[in-house]
Curated annotation (Swiss-Prot):
Protein keywords: Acyltransferase, Lipid biosynthesis, Lipid metabolism, Transferase
InterPro entries: Acyl_CoA_acyltransferase, Ornithine_N-alpha-AT
Gene this chain is encoded by: olsB
Enzyme class (EC, first level): transferase
Name this polypeptide is given: L-ornithine N(alpha)-acyltransferase
Domain of life: Bacteria
Reactions this protein catalyses: a (3R)-hydroxyacyl-[ACP] + L-ornithine = a lyso-ornithine lipid + holo-[ACP] + H(+)
Inactivation phenotype: Deletion of the gene abrogates lyso-ornithine lipid and ornithine lipid synthesis. It does not affect resistance to bactericidal peptides or permeability of the outer membrane. Does not influence pro-inflammatory responses or the ability to multiply intracellularly and generate chronic infections.
Similarity-based family: Belongs to the acetyltransferase family. OlsB subfamily.
A Pfam family the protein falls into: Acetyltransf_5
GO biological process: lipid metabolic process
Biological or metabolic pathway of the protein: Lipid metabolism
Record-listed E.C. numbers: 2.3.2.30
Length: 281
């Protein structure tokens, strides 16, 4: 079953996507067409390759899309600006890729398993309902609180509907030199490391130490200010950080592993978005 086929619980009886949240002209919902997925891939290409300088393969350069084998299996959370006078698939201004256990089985593993020992999570808690978050990006002119809130609203609604126990995935620092992010990485290592029962370690051949500075040398305020917005957002929710960073040469990033058990999400955020994700519906 493809990602599109697996989404029926979040579609209305007429096949239209159910709106998971709305703020003004912005709406968040799941992709329910190949045109929508391709539009998300085009947005990812513009952000990751044209803006951030990821390395283009031949097919990506020709098609102008960031696409891989996971896209047909995953669900794609999309933010639309319905006020734009263009066809619907061209209204997409933000995206998040979501993959549950059963989808990962069809893909022969989670995307982040290429960098981290995700299998440890599955083996230590075989009954956990896992959700991998990835490929998060937003058009530059829409990088605002409203857009981010709608992406979180959509992810939270998805978690509630699928009874997810833990969210995880890679988050990135721009640049493939860990030492350039010594302050941020060291802060995460000393203050945000996962507890033993949730810990996930970078694969041995990709492991990069994060404790590049002693704890007493870290200015916490400056470290947090230097942190990528996505990482800070995860931390505010209650996320923990896995053991070791990983260099992603293709995307030109230094990645860290995010682990966010639902039980650890800050109560104020659950109150804000609603226990049943009905804040912006």
């Amino acid at each position: 079953m493809s990602g599109l086929e697996a989404q029926q619980a979040l579609f209305a009886s007429n096949g239209d996507a159910i709106i998971l949240g709305r703020i003004g002209s912005l709406e968040v919902r799941l992709a329910n067409s190949r045109a929508a997925i391709q539009a998300a891939q085009e947005l990812r290409f513009r952000v990751f390759f044209e803006e951030m300088g990821a390395r283009k393969e031949t097919i990506e350069a020709v098609e102008q899309r960031d696409a891989d084998r996971f896209d047909t299996i995953c669900d794609h959370l999309l933010v639309y600006d319905t006020a734009l006078p263009v066809p619907e698939h061209q209204q997409i201004v933000g995206t998040y890729r979501l993959m549950r256990n059963e989808q990962a089985e069809k893909a022969l593993g989670f995307y982040s398993a290429d960098e981290y020992d995700v299998q440890r999570l599955k083996l230590s808690r075989p009954n956990l309902r896992l959700l991998e978050l990835g490929r998060s990006c937003v058009k530059p002119e829409y990088r605002s609180k409203r857009t981010v809130e709608l992406l979180w609203q959509g992810a939270w609604a998805y978690c509630r509907r699928h009874s997810i126990d833990v969210m995880f995935g890679c988050a990135s620092f721009h640049g493939a030199v860990p030492a350039a992010h010594a302050l941020g990485l060291s802060f995460l290592h000393h203050n945000c490391r996962a507890t033993d029962d949730w810990d996930v370690r970078a694969l041995p051949h990709r492991y990069q130490a994060m404790d590049l500075m002693p704890k007493e040398a870290i200015n916490n305020k400056v470290a947090l200010f230097s942190m990528p917005p996505l990482v800070k957002g995860y931390l505010r929710l209650g996320a923990m950080i896995g053991d070791g960073a990983v260099i992603d040469e293709a995307f030109g990033t230094t990645d860290v592993f995010i682990i966010l058990p639902i039980e650890r999400i800050s109560s104020r955020y659950i109150s804000y978005y609603g226990a049943e994700a009905n804040r912006f519906v």
